[in-house]
Amino acid sequence: MFLTHEFHQIVLIKRHSRWMNTHIHLERFGHARWALNISVVTETFPPDINGVAHTLSKMVSGLQANGHDIWLVRPRQQKTQLAQSGQGFNELLVKGMPIPFYKQLRMGLPAKKELHRLWSFKRPDVVHIATEGPLGWSALQVARKLRIPVSTDFRTNFHAYSSHYGIGWLSGAILSYMRKFHNAADATMVPTQQLADSLHNSGFERLQVVPRGIDTLLFSPAKRSHFLRDSWKATENQIVMLYVGRLAAEKNLKLVLQTYAMAKQ
């Protein structure tokens, strides 16, 4: 479930009967054929600065622009209570605690009672869970109990990252938990076919490839700056590569350097 500037991929729900399984699939179209009530559960959202927060912000803004109603569920952060978004939406703020290795962020604690109360009062058409922490797990359990369709995001290879932080011995247990978590959903969104193939080989089911969108008005050849290129000492036709992100082992920056070397050939 992700938005580009031109296209909007909206989660559609097909329930053939009360007693049959729910099927979630993606379809591209412009303005919504009908308005959906979507509850988004996440550990992070702007003003947090990270890839998941930025991606979710774009997704929520795009869904709102197409007429959908969003209810955001997230832990209360230290510096702010209200999320930042281009348009208003409802929020449920829950208790949280600092995340190990990312103390600037807070991990949502289980919130079964709050979620059951909210979703019983205002039942969503679909619950979308972006993170797999205690808050996400409790959201998954409540949604299943209330028979609400659930989609999830697989954005972070926590099992692969574990070796970079001295807990590689937990890799198998982490992967097992992630597989159990996502396989309990009706659909799991992944950004690339490569990741989908890898997860499928590890026993993950109902994977949907949803590539990252690009704002073609913001990132456009019309904004090309010769002054900026001159400051880089880059010629007119020379390829310039830019990496934006943390300098961390799990970012696989060796691949960036290898790609750069191949591009120069």
Please state what every model-predicted region is:
Residues 100-129, 134-141, 145, 172-176:
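An amphipathic, basic-hydrophobic alpha-helix
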Residues 211-220:
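Short beta-strand->alpha-helix junction loop in the catalytic core
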Residues 182-192, 208-210:
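A short beta-strand/loop micro-motif in the catalytic core of glycosyltransferases
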Residues 2, 7, 11-95:
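N-terminal subdomain of nucleotide-sugar transferases
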Residues 220-234:
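A short helix/loop element that forms part of the nucleotide-sugar donor recognition site in Leloir-type
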Residues 234-251, 257-262:
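Conserved donor-binding/catalytic core segment of Leloir-type glycosyltransferases
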Residues 76, 194, 213:
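Carbohydrate-associated surface elements
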Residues 149-151, 160-180, 190:
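Nucleotide-sugar donor phosphate/pyrophosphate-binding loop at the beta->alpha transition
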